[in-house]
């Protein structure tokens, strides 16, 4: 091919020639950048790069919240110089040390998660533009601030699909730059990897926001709807008498064609369609903006994937992308369940039938000639999957295929157990399977049944069993009654928080009279089973916190009922309000949680969003009480979501397994010089309480996590009523779950007597006098002296010197 050069040509003498100009590479982004620069009000970081947030914001966070590194091993195996032993402060052959290497390891996981969401967004955006055109409006509900994460990063406020493209290009460009820093001989400083990880986290929330806003607009999902329909959830909701199509993954694009085919052929009441992971959440949002009676169902999280397959219930399985088990094809093949791969990111080595005739492909799959196929043509996919499900069901019913053992087989397998303990050692949850098998030998299967909810369905136990006992099948066999009764309700993902809801709650959140926002997100790698997140959500809802949920957390909360048979979604309203349980949607909907905090700053406080991340994050860190919970986090996406919250000043608590991410961000509360900010009115330094005391940490139990999260909602700007409310909750929860007296550092958060919980104010004043030496005026019941922090209702705390008036 000849090299293109600059020049010109004339069309003056040409006849009957049509010249078509399609996309000009980079033109949309260049035009967007020029448009953003013309903004009258804009912050300093429009279209930021790797260095943009480093000195102005990230290093300020990392100075207070120091990285705590938890290596998985002492070696680095990145290049052919290695493996290198980095223990004992040694450096590798390339010069990197343990801190730098582990900073890179954590950073790599964050950019992997960011790339996953960004690629999801790119796939949806391109497909939806091709299907609906660039002019399709972003109708997301009654809001003017539609895309706060996009706006913060780029200054753009897209109003249709086409206007989203520059933001998508920006994320992809920066991801390339970030990935380059992982190469050997690039970055080696742990703190700079942390800064880059924070930047990548901010990009992740842009990628997620793109993914969700385009699908909400195009697929007619609920639009900021607090009354979104309730959806059936659980394995027990599946009608086994009907053909069953099971969809797994996170990208709902292809599933919408299956649902359209069902509706066009009047099959919605003749077969079941249900899903696992976030595809399940999003298929139940499809065309639900008008609250039509839903027919799609949710089975549950990734932890249920192998359990559902082993049950033999699905007649066809369709996978798209993300959080899909790598052994689905061999597991499904044992039970003659065809597997259809509908996304190029997961193809499982299956034959590609995208260009083949649908009838021929159905015959291949029915006969078992192929275990499954790749189908990337969505029109064909819709027809193929529905027709195949209807035709496979009678074939599989006639054969009676299932992996669940008979009673006789169960007894034989249990008797084979040698009590060697290999399964216990292999289990990531440390389930005492040998003990349960011992009781089963005596005829007591209740211990095995008790493992059902805690088991994450990984089958590591089966792979180490020398007797080749199908342990997962045994657990599922003895839990058949429990599975049949596994029926709950989950509110369909409602989409973003509306501007009106922010206006109604913004003041309460900033003043502290609404105790805080608790965001329960993430994966199912729980240490003690799914009910942990139910307990946590219920406790905070009872105390009038706003509880927002997404993804697996949103599903698992809906699995359990109270004594009256009601789930939390039935007991609490779906609005963004005190005591509201707000299911935002799937994993990509997490962007609306950070978006809500950003909108508090933009709508309530009138702060500029455009290119202004540091100021918005500074506002959130000092004023908006919020804490995330990723109790079962396992994936790279969970790390990128959490890190995107961290750069915005939102702390997150992770479950006990999450130390394997290799890094936490925890402040030293005793270093008083780290707990000073500027008063924006005059630029003077002012002390603040150690709140929040971490940005990223882990807890061992849900009982430990609850008071930790309540404390993490305390903010320097709380007024006295808000501070008293927050102290009440934190201190009560500490006593309830950790036992004994008040937390040892409660007094650090008291600025005057009005900050003290009203119910036991006098008793606490006595403690302050006796234990801390504070001077109390007992006639007026006022604190005369003692607090190091004085309350000033008009103070304007900021970490950014440039925001002070004198600056």
Swiss-Prot record:
The keyword Iron-sulfur applies. Pathway: One-carbon metabolism; methanogenesis from acetate. This is Acetyl-CoA decarbonylase/synthase complex subunit alpha 2. Binds 7 [4Fe-4S] clusters per heterotetramer. It catalyses: CO + 2 oxidized [2Fe-2S]-[ferredoxin] + H2O = 2 reduced [2Fe-2S]-[ferredoxin] + CO2 + 2 H(+). Its cofactor is [4Fe-4S] cluster; [Ni-4Fe-4S] cluster. It comes from Methanosarcina mazei (strain ATCC BAA-159 / DSM 3647 / Goe1 / Go1 / JCM 11833 / OCM 88). Its EC number is 1.2.7.4. [4Fe-4S] cluster 3 binds at residues 417, 420, 423, 465. Belongs to the Ni-containing carbon monoxide dehydrogenase family. Cluster B is an all-cysteinyl-liganded 4Fe-4S cluster; cluster C is a mixed Ni-Fe-S cluster which is the active site of CO oxidation. Cluster D is also an all-cysteinyl-liganded 4Fe-4S cluster that bridges the two subunits of the CODH dimer. Contains two additional 4Fe-4S clusters, dubbed E and F, that probably transport electrons from ferredoxin to the B cluster. Residues 407-436, 446-475 form the 4Fe-4S ferredoxin-type domain. [4Fe-4S] cluster 1 binds at residues 73, 77. GO terms for molecular function: 4 iron, 4 sulfur cluster binding; anaerobic carbon-monoxide dehydrogenase activity; hydroxylamine reductase activity; iron ion binding; nickel cation binding; peroxidase activity. CDD domains: ACS_1. CO binds at residue 117. [4Fe-4S] cluster 2 binds at residues 76, 79, 84, 94. [4Fe-4S] cluster 4 binds at residues 427, 455, 458, 461.
